[in-house]
């Protein structure tokens, strides 16, 4: 697509890999099906991602007390459950490519329907259509968004949540993410879909972009800030991120060369670093208590407060800016933290 987006090469080999991944995929495997939590970077207080997002969007979205919502790619129903909790008078619908979680979703309070198949074929129109970590899986995101615009009521809103690859280079490592978004690219994709950007934030959920879009009949200020966005800029951006990932891997190997290390995190970045270091990993450390119940990559998962977590130096598998915040917040645990390399200056 002509929007200077970073995308995977959409080859037959890539599609075969993706088909294999989706056949074997288990949602939120490490936490036993529980949605990942979001931690307050200052206090460490944890809350579910969906509930956190909806609470932070209360004022920007200004939703009515009642309405209809369509959650596209609803997974096992985390966002639907949070919506039913905060807005009990709303009628909720979910869609998925298959009916693996049909029973769980249909049992949620407020859910009136669950559909499989193409999202744009879902009957009816809605006051809110949500795409939470869906758009990055779509090879042609503008076309996909345009197909969903017909599902919006005239005053309806489309809510999008995607990874921010500029703030989180680890997003580039995820095989089934076909499109990698920056704020400028997401804004352009929304406009190419014939929609207007009502909201675009990168601070509501760490490492993620949050956008709200509406039909163009609504009067909103136009922010034409895309004149400098070019394929050359995108290539330079992604090259810098890949070089950073390589430096991180090299530094981590050096730390683990003589003595095993701990790895903070059991999500994508932790998985990548664990695979990079192999037997150089002694254990993983994670603040999410739901991830302590089972080993990860054959190694125990410890809480930062566990005495055993102090036995080795622990590498923070996070972007540098977030790793510094976490290390500061957890400095009283007694763990010797190893920060990732600082990013190259632009």
Predicted regions and their residues:
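Conserved N-terminal segment of class I S-adenosyl-L-methionine
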Residues: 1-124, 128, 132, 145, ...
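A short helix->loop->beta-strand "cap" motif at the edges of active sites that frequently abuts
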Residues: 89-90, 153-156, 333-336
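Short catalytic micro-motifs in class I SAM-dependent methyltransferases
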Residues: 132-134, 139
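A short glycine-rich, Lys/Arg-flanked "PGG" loop and its adjoining helix->strand segment in the class I
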Residues: 143-157
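A short hydrophobic/small-residue beta-strand
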Residues: 158-159, 197
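Short, glycine-/aromatic-enriched active-site segment of Class I SAM-dependent methyltransferases
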Residues: 159-189
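Conserved S-adenosyl-L-methionine
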Residues: 195-206
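Hydrophobic, well-ordered beta-alpha structural blocks that scaffold small-molecule cofactor pockets
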Residues: 212, 216-346
């Amino acid at each position: 697509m002509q929007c200077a987006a970073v995308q995977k090469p959409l080859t037959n080999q890539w599609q075969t890999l993706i088909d294999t991944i989706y056949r074997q995929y288990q949602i939120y495997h490490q936490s036993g099906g529980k949605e990942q939590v979001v931690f307050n970077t200052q206090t460490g207080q944890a809350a579910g991602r969906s509930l956190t997002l909806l609470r932070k969007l209360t004022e920007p979205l200004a939703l009515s007390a009642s309405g209809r919502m369509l959650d596209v790619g609803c997974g096992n129903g985390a966002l639907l459950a949070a919506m039913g909790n905060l807005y009990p008078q709303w009628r909720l619908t979910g869609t998925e490519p298959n009916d693996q979680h049909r029973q769980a979703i249909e049992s949620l309070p407020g859910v009136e329907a669950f559909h499989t198949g193409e999202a744009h074929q879902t009957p009816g129109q809605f006051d809110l259509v949500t795409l939470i970590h869906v758009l990055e899986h779509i090879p042609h995101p503008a076309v996909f968004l345009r197909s969903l615009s017909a599902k919006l009521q005239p005053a309806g809103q489309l809510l999008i949540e995607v990874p921010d690859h500029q703030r989180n280079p680890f997003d580039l490592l995820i095989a089934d993410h076909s499109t990698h978004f920056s704020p400028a690219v997401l804004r352009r994709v929304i406009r190419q879909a014939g929609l207007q950007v009502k909201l675009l934030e990168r601070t509501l959920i760490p490492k993620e972009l949050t956008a709200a879009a509406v039909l163009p009949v609504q009067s909103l200020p136009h922010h034409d800030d895309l004149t400098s966005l070019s394929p050359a800029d995108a290539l330079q951006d992604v090259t810098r991120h890949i070089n950073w990932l390589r430096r991180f891997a090299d530094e981590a190997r050096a730390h683990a060369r003589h003595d095993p290390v701990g790895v903070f995190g059991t999500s994508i970045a932790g998985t990548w670093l664990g695979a990079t270091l192999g037997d150089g990993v002694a254990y993983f450390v994670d603040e999410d208590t739901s991830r302590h119940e089972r080993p990860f990559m054959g190694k125990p998962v410890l809480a930062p407060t566990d005495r055993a977590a102090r036995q080795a130096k622990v590498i923070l598998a996070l972007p540098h800016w977030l790793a510094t915040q976490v290390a500061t917040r957890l400095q009283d645990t007694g763990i010797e933290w190893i920060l990732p390399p600082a990013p190259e200056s632009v």
